[in-house]
């Protein structure tokens, strides 16, 4: 089973908890009762919180700033402590791809962020590849994996990819919640992951 459902944009803290944490718990219990062999949970790199520009490793402490990543981290904790279910966690970065308006939709929220702030990203194709690799692995060496492409572009570059001027940096404090670069070496070393779109420019 691959569990990707989540409530993110516009969710209150209560809604994020109800859907992303409690909803995941209910689904996991149902999966165990149905003898599901493997349960893959897509989480978020935002669980690490502000990293100060240093890529976060899977074993680093997590300090989520907003309700959404906090609810995802709570769900991770429940799943990883659960007995009788083979759980694998894939922490995703900012996901983009053909026909996906994610970048355009995020522009208003990030308009006040620093233009030089970098963001870990992954193309849809690479997310699908990573999900398949992790789901098919008979016995992965770890239970939690980060997923990132080879290059974390600046927000100015991300904005330019959809023809928008760079963000103005007027709300740098709010941007801290999204300043979460990730280290992607583990999934490459353990599972042989290699992105088909290693850089944003490769997908444009």
Protein language model features and the residues they cover:
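Glycine-rich NAD(P)-binding loop of the Rossmann-fold in SDR/ketoreductase-type enzymes
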Residues: 15-26, 62, 66, 70-73, ...
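Mid/C-terminal beta-alpha module of Rossmann-like enzyme folds, strongest
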Residues: 128-184
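Active-site Tyr-X1-5-Lys
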Residues: 50, 63-88
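Conserved Rossmann-fold NAD(P)-dependent oxidoreductase catalytic core, especially the SDR/UDP-sugar
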Residues: 25-67
């Amino acid at each position: 089973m691959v569990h990707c459902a989540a409530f993110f944009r516009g969710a209150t803290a209560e809604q994020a908890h109800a859907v992303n944490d409690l909803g995941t718990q209910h689904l996991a219990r149902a999966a165990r009762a149905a003898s599901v062999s493997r349960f893959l949970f897509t989480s978020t790199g935002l669980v690490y919180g502000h990293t100060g520009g240093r890529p976060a490793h899977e074993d680093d402490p997590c300090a989520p700033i907003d309700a959404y990543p906090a609810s995802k981290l709570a769900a991770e904790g429940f799943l990883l402590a659960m007995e009788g279910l083979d759980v694998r966690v894939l922490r995703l970065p900012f996901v983009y791809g053909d026909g996906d308006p994610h970048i355009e939709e995020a522009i208003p929220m990030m308009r006040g962020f620093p233009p030089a702030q970098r963001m870990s990203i992954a193309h849809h194709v690479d997310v699908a590849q990573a999900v398949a690799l992790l789901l098919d692995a008979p016995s992965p060496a770890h239970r939690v994996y980060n997923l990132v492409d080879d290059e974390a572009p600046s927000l100015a570059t991300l904005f330019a990819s959809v023809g928008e001027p760079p963000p103005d940096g007027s709300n740098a404090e709010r941007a801290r919640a999204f300043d979460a670069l990730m280290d992607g070496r583990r999934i490459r070393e353990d599972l042989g992951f290699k992105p088909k779109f290693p850089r944003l420019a490769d997908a444009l």
